Amino acid sequence: VPELRALIGEVAAEQLERSGSDDPRGVSAALRVCFTRLMKSEKKFFVDQLNMLVKRISQEGKDTSGSNGDLLLRLHSQYPGDIGCFTIYFLNLVRLEPGEAMFLGANEPHAYLHGDCVECMACSDNTVRAGLTPKFIDVLTLCEMLNYTPAPSSSKIFPATQSQLDPSVYLYDPPVPDFAIMRIETPASIKLYLVSAVDSASILLVIQGTAVGTSTAAASEMTLRRGSVLFISANESISLHLSSPDGMLLFRACCLL
């Protein structure tokens, strides 16, 4: 992408090109230099280069998949003149199917571009933005804190495991102790379902279906439908009286202590 190359400069671009897969530290260092030069570009310069790239891709009239042309044009239409449009060339483009999940460690840049997902993250007060946003971008902190270790997108995707105790539960258990996600799918044949107690507090989100919930901690019955969110105390179970003809789909965030 010549417009991106103009922004990061020939020296940095050649350094990245010379970095081999057998030298991960060298690749990381080169990526850091290139990304930092991009993010520190003078606004008029990167806006001019972005407009040139958009014009070139729009006029090519052919397959632009090699340069993520369709994605670039869509993002530019949503965030015109945003430096984040160029960051797609540093990231993997991942399309998740329903039920799939991925785990991103601390300081790994990412962006949700389209669709809906359930996101859970560790407690943090240092969310730093890189672009594709009208909010403040702290460039110096961002470039310093990021993890520049390259990896294929397949290494970030991990499957859910079906519970041996409850076949309706699929567990997404990431390699950190901060949180876990449960996907609960109840078939239409089940009219009474028990959300089992766990040792931590948890949050229950209803994606599909309707039910009336009861628990020893609740003073009255709770009507649950699409979009309902329920806080469940530690060691508390919830009985769901299902009324949906298509069953229910719920997600539960908790800690596995």
What is the meaning of each model-derived region?
Residues 115-171:
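C-terminal, non-catalytic macromolecule-binding modules
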Residues 1-62, 134-156, 181-183:
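Transition-metal
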Residues 66-118, 123-128:
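Short catalytic-site patches enriched in acidic/histidine residues
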Residues 164-168, 177-198, 234-235:
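Conserved short histidine dyad/triad with adjacent acidic residue
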Residues 93-103, 108-111, 118, 184, ...:
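Short acidic-glycine-tyrosine-enriched beta hairpin
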Residues 39, 43-45, 49-51, 58-83, ...:
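Glycine- and acidic-residue-biased ligand/ion/polar-headgroup-sensing regions
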Residues 111-112, 171-176:
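Short, conserved, surface-exposed binding loops centered on an aromatic residue
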Residues 115-134, 179, 231, 244-257:
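A short hydrophobic beta-strand segment most commonly corresponding to one strand
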